[in-house]
Structure formats: C-alpha cells, structure tokens
C-alpha cells in the first residue's frame, strides 16, 4: 500500500533520564535519524545533575530542569512527571507537531498536558512493562499506555502483550544500531581500556546492565563461577547500572554470591564492576570481550545485543522473546535464562574457535539489518496521523527506509 508523503515535522521525544540506559540510547538515536530524514526532532530528559546526556547528541537535545529526589520509586517518578509538566507549562514550550513519550514518566506528563489542552495528544513507545506492587506506579504505568493517542513497540512480543492485557493496538517499529560507531575494527583505545580494567590473558565475559534482577546478573555470576573451574584465568566485566530504580536488595544478593564463590571484585580481579561506562569506550569494551553474556529475563529488544554483534562479539541470549523474534539459530547462543548450568555451558561453547567465527559473521549480518534511518521511517505514518496537516511536504522515503516502512509487521 502506498503511503502519502509526510510533511516536515517538529517532534518532541521525551525519555526518562540522561543516563546510559537502552531506552535513552534509543531516544537519542531515533532523534538523530529523524533529523537525517529532514525532520526536527528534539530529545528531552530530566537532568538533576545538570551534566546533560551521557553522550553528545547529533540532534537538538534539552536537559529538563529537575531536582534530586530521595525516598521511594513512586516519589521519584512523581517528581519527574512534575519536572516535565513545569517544563512544558507554556505554549512556547509546546511548539511541536508531535509529542513522543518513550517511558511511563513522560507518558504521564503528556497525558496531563493533553487533558489540559496544551497539546493535542501524544505517541507512546512501550519498550517493556515493569511489574510493580506499588499501586501508584501501576496506575501511572496504565495511564501512560491507555491515554496515548497511538502506541508503538520495538517488538511483536510487547505489541501482543498490550493487545492481551490492555486491549490496545501498537505498531511495531523495531530499533537500530549505529554501524559507524560500533565496528569490529580494533583501535589503540582497545588495549588502553584493557589495561585500565586490569584484564589478563584469560577469556573475558561481559555483562551489561549492572546488578539488576531484570538483567539476571545473579545467574551470570553463578554461571561464571562454574566456568572458572575450567578457566581459572577468566574474568567477568559487569558494566552499567545507571537506573532510576532502587536495586539495593538484588545487589546485596549478587554481592553475597560473589563472596560465597570466592570471586574478588576490582580492577584486575576475577570480577570487574565498571559502573556506567563512557559512551566513547563502549565499542572497545565490546571488542575486548570474548563474549557478551545477556540472559535477560525481560527486554524491550536488547540494544546491547546489536551493539556487541556490530563489534563482532559473540552473544549469549535468553531463548525467549524478544530475542527469538530477530535472532535465528546460529546467530547467537540461546539458553534457558533460569538454568545457570546452561549459561555456563554456552559461555564455554562461545570460546570454541570455529563456533566463534560463525557467530561473529552471523552477528554482523544481524546488526547490518538494523538501520536507524529505516527505524525512524517506520515511525512516520504514526506521526502523520497525529500531526497537523499544514506542514511542508517532504519527499517520500526511498531505498532501505522505504522498503522497511512498507514491510515491517503492522499487527501483533
């Protein structure tokens, strides 16, 4: 079906944080791709530190004034909603054709702005849905979905969840990876990072996301401990962990497991916790790792999987959606994420030279298929449904962007 050309749009993209999290990285890359397609996309995020986004953006980006907040997760989310409402309290601040929420926080702010008639409505991307026992958080999660004018998901899995649990239809837009930044080509910075982390000659395994239950870090630690019996020089790098939520209880369990297994933590030790990693160092971190171990229990898509594959690093993932949507057998090692023995066996298998070569080649092909400009083009029909009709018309997308716009699955 031929779609009408989309006019030049001013798009406000709102995410929950300036920290290096998958949803934030997605928002920035989407904004950059939309600008390359001729639109004006401005990415917003609450910024209590005043330091700006975790990386320099190649599109307009606004750090929304926000104050540090202590206490419960509900108190934090409520404060961040209020920060957004204060920022968009004037017609001048609301001078956009399309408002696009990437999270529950911004979805609730835009829902309130819609009810106040400061904006005509908004698009919401649901990356995943966090289960919560807090009634207020659950209410906010539901409102940010049901009050949206249009819904998007990265995967068919989450689109199906929205249909089943909320009776809501979502279009599937996928995601992308920056193939100019994430490449398999080594550089001198790789060895410098290796030295700074104290990595030796043994195999290096990488876990991304910090100590967080959703990332299944405890199972990774236990699997790594089992693997070290055959590879005593192996090291595990646990990167990231910048989260708005409190994971102290789960972190304590991870630390107890490390102590129980006799795994020392620190530079040059069996386990290295980096905390948030500078964006400039991430490609090197993927390249110096032998394997990305990512048996996550719940993901919207798994951006770090694509980044690792683009860098030529073999990947271990959970044998469940959304990974099964875009990874065929032989493109990654798939495991039952609740079976630490299976994770350890996959870590061992990932070191076999022949298998490594096949995984590297297949992974790079997967990454090449995830193009940000094509992902951005898949957003445009949804934007056009909510945008005013008097914007100047841009030429229709051509090439890969047009192909993907027409062929992305539209119903889930």
Residue locations for each model-derived region?
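N-terminal strand-loop element at the rim of the active site
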Residues: 4-7, 14-21, 28-82
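Nucleotide-activated donor-binding/catalytic signature segment of Leloir-type glycosyltransferases, i.e.
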Residues: 251-280
